[in-house]
Amino acid sequence: EIIRPTAFFKSLSGQIDRVKKGKSFLIFGNGELTSCKPISARDLSKFIIPLVTRSQSENKIHIIGGPGPPISPKRQAELLFELCKKEKKITHISPKLFLVITYALIPLSIVSKKIRDLREFLKIAYYYATESMLFWDEKIGSYSSNKTPEYGNESLEEYYKKILKNDVVYKELKDQKLF
């Protein structure tokens, strides 16, 4: 069994501190290039337990999202500014910047493992900045939020509220700061 959540709440929380400090929210492209249906760790655990405890495996990929409509980075930014009661400031960054830097670092990557690792991170960042984390519908050749299975009842908005009230221990994120 492969369980593929569309996104985790934590992975969409990297810019909370920026917004709380009144800084701009970083968005790739127009902020509508990608979307996902994030799921909480608790809801995902409840989804996984019956799969791993059953007697026979189905040997399939389980794409799973949280409840409700998909959220784009633009909507995520709007939600955070609203919850933090801050003026909306958004900085748009071209996702192609990841590719430009990746290619510019090729010569240095020959002699440096750190640079090779950085190039790999930039490739992954480009993917996440340009591809939705939803069900890929082969018939229509695009992502489908309608066909992305939903599970649970915890929302990203409620998670953000808990972080902002300090009801959830929120640790500094490293790689998630862009998302």
Language-model features and meaning:
Residues 1-86:
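Oxidoreductase cofactor-interface core, primarily capturing Rossmann-like NAD(P)-dependent enzymes
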Residues 23-24, 88, 109, 116:
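Secondary-structure boundary/capping signal
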Residues 87-88, 170:
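Residue-level detector of short coil/turn "hinge" positions at structural boundaries
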Residues 89-93:
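General small-molecule cofactor/ligand-binding pocket signal
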Residues 96-179:
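A hydrophobic C-terminal alpha-helical subdomain
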